């Protein structure tokens, strides 16, 4: 989000940007800058908690922020503020996942089946136009700091794998491979793979 943007992401060179450091917001910024031939070295990053990010963009001192929903919706409503780049422009890079260690899964194959079954049982409820579905969306909206409508607006703006076959197709795609490679490279560069990681190939 930029206030009174003139030139979009390309104009961020030398600018200060507030975000939660080493988060998906940080990663999104890195990808946005890269697309414009820039890097993190070209900007000044100020680590700002998600509790403070909306108040920050409302102040006169802050012109540029990166954040996630539902905070994004609130921040973008600031007079003069405009979304100049979002995760839809790098599809497949920012995902919400449930992961299980490979060896653990090999040793406990029933665990994978149980988790997957539970996941898609919840997905079916979440997608449904039933009272159960409405209750689930209202609960998750409140849990994520918004309400049912706010949560449903978020769902409408996300690519959801409602069916298992679409998730499998994506996981096996070149797009997913490239996205995960970019994520691990970023993670290694910023020390997120741990002190003992010798290279990005650690993951």
Role assignments for model-derived ranges:
Residues 22, 43, 86, 150-151, ...:
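Residue-level detector of family-conserved "landmark" positions at structurally sensitive sites
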Residues 191-203:
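Intrinsically disordered, low-complexity polar segments
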Residues 19, 40, 83, 148, ...:
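Residue-level detector of short coil/turn "hinge" positions at structural boundaries
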Residues 1-78:
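Bilobed "Venus flytrap"/periplasmic-binding protein-like clamshell domains
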Residues 51-147:
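Pocket-lining segment of extracytoplasmic ligand-binding domains
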Residues 106-194:
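Secondary-structure end/capping motifs
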């Amino acid at each position: 989000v930029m206030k009174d943007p003139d030139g979009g992401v390309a104009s961020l060179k030398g600018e200060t940007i507030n975000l939660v450091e080493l988060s998906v917001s940080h990663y999104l910024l890195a990808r946005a800058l890269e697309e414009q031939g820039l890097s993190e070295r070209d900007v000044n990053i100020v680590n700002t908690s998600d509790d403070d990010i909306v108040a920050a963009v409302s102040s006169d001192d802050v012109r540029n922020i990166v954040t996630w929903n539902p905070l994004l919706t609130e921040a973008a409503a600031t007079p003069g503020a405009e979304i100049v780049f979002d995760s839809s422009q790098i599809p497949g890079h920012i995902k919400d996942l449930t992961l299980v260690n490979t060896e653990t899964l090999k040793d406990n194959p029933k665990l994978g089946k149980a988790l997957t079954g539970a996941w898609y049982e919840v997905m079916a409820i979440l997608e449904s136009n039933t009272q159960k579905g409405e209750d689930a969306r209202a609960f998750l909206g409140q849990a994520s700091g918004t309400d049912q409508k706010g949560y449903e607006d978020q769902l409408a703006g996300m690519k959801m794998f409602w069916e298992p076959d679409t998730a499998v197709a994506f996981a096996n795609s070149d797009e997913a491979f490239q996205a995960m490679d970019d994520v691990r490279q970023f993670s290694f560069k910023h020390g997120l793979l741990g002190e003992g990681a010798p290279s990005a190939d650690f993951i």
